[in-house]
């Protein structure tokens, strides 16, 4: 399915063939971005995520970087480590699922008001399938915020070629011109 973008087969294959569940088994209660990046991301979330909405924090951890003063109806977290997700005070509920094995989200169609993928999209082996699932569960016009970092677990890398094309093809950005 990934070759729908004209990418070679295996373009998103990771360097390390080990099962992702093994890599994510030990909890990592650390910040994956620095204070400046956290402040910038929180500020952006403040402007784009709908207060009172249902949010999906895909590929989450023990912290979501959401503005502390804004309330949301529900924040659904997804990740690979139950300890990390359970430690996240902003999550209303959460689920553990390896999206590289099964990219289908256990959520109803058009049930989410906004979604975030914070510094993690580069670890997906089926990013197009996951983005299609996000398009399915997001309400029409709902934002998807994908943030990036210059940090990466090198043993768990995917080739980044095509991620921007994947995002643009399946979650087009509204025009920002006046």
Regions found by a protein language model. Name each.
Residues 113-128:
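A short SAM/SAH-binding and catalytic strip from SAM-dependent methyltransferases
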Residues 50, 125, 139:
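Short conserved AdoMet
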Residues 32-36, 40-106:
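Class I SAM-dependent methyltransferase SAM/SAH-binding core
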Residues 128-143:
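A short glycine-rich, Lys/Arg-flanked "PGG" loop and its adjoining helix->strand segment in the class I
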Residues 52, 112-113:
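Local beta-strand N-terminus motif with an aromatic residue
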Residues 1-51:
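Class I SAM-dependent methyltransferase Rossmann-like catalytic core
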Residues 143-176:
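Conserved class I S-adenosyl-L-methionine
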């Amino acid at each position: 399915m990934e070759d729908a973008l004209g990418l070679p087969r295996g373009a998103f294959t990771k360097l390390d063939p080990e099962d992702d569940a093994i890599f994510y088994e030990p909890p990592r209660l650390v910040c994956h971005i620095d204070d400046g990046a956290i402040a910038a991301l929180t500020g952006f979330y403040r402007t784009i995520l709908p207060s009172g909405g249902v949010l999906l924090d895909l590929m989450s951890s023990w912290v979501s970087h959401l503005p502390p003063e804004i309330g949301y109806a529900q924040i659904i977290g997804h990740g690979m480590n139950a300890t990390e997700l359970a430690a996240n005070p902003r999550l209303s509920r959460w689920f553990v699922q390896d999206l590289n094995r099964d990219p289908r989200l256990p959520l109803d169609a058009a049930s989410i008001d906004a979604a975030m993928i914070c510094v993690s999209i580069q670890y997906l082996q089926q990013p197009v399938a996951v983005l299609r699932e996000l398009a399915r569960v997001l309400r029409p016009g709902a934002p998807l915020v994908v943030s990036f970092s210059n940090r990466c677990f090198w043993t768990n890398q995917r080739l980044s070629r095509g991620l921007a094309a994947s995002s643009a093809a399946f979650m087009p950005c509204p025009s920002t011109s006046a």
